[in-house]
Structures are given as structure tokens and as C-alpha cells.
A protein has these predicted regions:
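The feature marks the mature, well-folded catalytic cores of soluble enzymes
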Residues: 1-174
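Cysteine-centered iron-sulfur cluster-binding motifs in ferredoxin-type domains/subunits
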Residues: 173-182
Length: 182
């Protein structure tokens, strides 16, 4: 199940994203209400309006139930810090934090160019990312996760690093500039 609100709307509608940062921007409130009524069990059509707060609350309740049932979560990561083995998830809704803390097993999938050497480097990227992607000073949620801790969060962890031809691009003196994009 997709946990980002806009991605959830797209998934429940069996639709395709229309924008990389705002995947459901092509859907109006009335459409979203109808999608929720059709896909989320237990919603009352007589009380659910197309008010954004009500729609967000319906999605929150739906997702919370899924989070509490999930034994395994698959998450991405914005950065991985080699110095400490820390993964960083930057987001605006708190859904990533739920993935990092509630399931028994966490599987994180990350492109290799997201691996950075030190905490000092992370500080720079945490300032650049929100300014570059959404023109914000900072993201609402930044979660840092440094592995399994007995009795706290996932007790099993797997990191999948994806290359996708990036090492070939990195080896190319001209092509490597393409990997500078955060």
C-alpha cells in the first residue's frame, strides 16, 4: 500500500501520477472523495464530504490501520551516511516515519548516488533538498535511522542499493555531472 497521500489517491484510483512532486494534482476534491468511498471500507457517504480536512482524516485512519497491521515495510531513503550507517528519510506527511518505526522488518531501497560520506555532508544536503525540490527552507519531517535497536522499531533490516548503470555514468567524465542532481 502506498503511504504518501497523493500516491495513495493515484493507487486507489488505479491511475498514473501526473507530476513527480504532486502525483494527484489532476484530481479534484469531489473525485478524491469518490475514490475514497469506493476503495476505503467503512466510510459513510452521508458524512464524508470533499472538505480537505475530512479527506485527509479518512486517509489517515485508513493508513494508520494498515501501518499497525504491517509486519514488513518497504521504504526509500533520501540519503545514507557511510560514517554511521544512518539512513535519512525526508518527507512532508509523517508516513515515512511510520514505516521506519512500526513494522517488524524494514526493507529500504536506495539508489547508490544517495550514499554520502559524512554527517557534515548530510547537513549540506538537508539544506539543499527542500530548497531545490519545493522551494521550502526545510522539510516538515526528517527521520534518521541507524539500524536495529532491541525493543524499538524494526528488528530486522535489509538495505537494497540500486546501481541502474550509475557506476558507468560516474566513470564517464562528462556523464558524471548528471549524478549531481539531488
Amino acid at each position: 500500500i502506498e503511504t504518501d497521500l497523493a500516491e495513495l489517491i493515484v493507487q486507489l484510483a488505479d491511475d498514473r501520477p501526473s507530476h513527480i512532486l504532486v502525483p494527484a494534482i489532476h484530481r479534484g476534491r469531489a473525485e478524491i472523495r469518490q475514490i475514497f468511498l469506493e476503495a476505503m471500507p467503512g466510510l459513510d457517504p452521508g458524512t464524508l464530504t470533499d472538505d480537505p480536512r475530512q479527506l485527509a482524516e479518512a486517509a489517515r485512519a485508513y493508513l494508520r490501520e494498515a501501518f499497525l497491521r504491517a509486519r514488513v515495510a518497504v521504504s526509500g531513503a533520501n540519503f545514507g551516511v557511510v560514517e554511521t550507517g544512518t539512513l535519512t528519510v525526508v518527507e512532508s506527511e509523517g508516513n515515512g516515519r511510520m514505516c521506519l518505526t512500526l513494522p517488524e522488518t524494514l526493507i529500504t531501497v536506495m539508489w547508490i548516488e544517495k550514499v554520502i560520506p559524512t554527517w557534515r555532508d548530510l547537513e549540506v544536503f538537508l539544506q539543499l533538498l527542500p530548497r531545490s525540490s519545493t522551494a521550502e527552507r526545510m522539510n516538515p519531517y526528517t527521520s534518521l535511522w541507524t539500524g536495529v535497536q532491541p525493543g524499538d522499531g524494526p528488528q530486522e533490516f535489509h538495505l537494497v542499493l540500486l546501481d541502474g548503470g550509475r557506476t558507468d555514468v560516474l566513470a564517464d567524465e562528462v556523464g558524471r555531472a548528471a549524478l549531481h542532481c539531488i
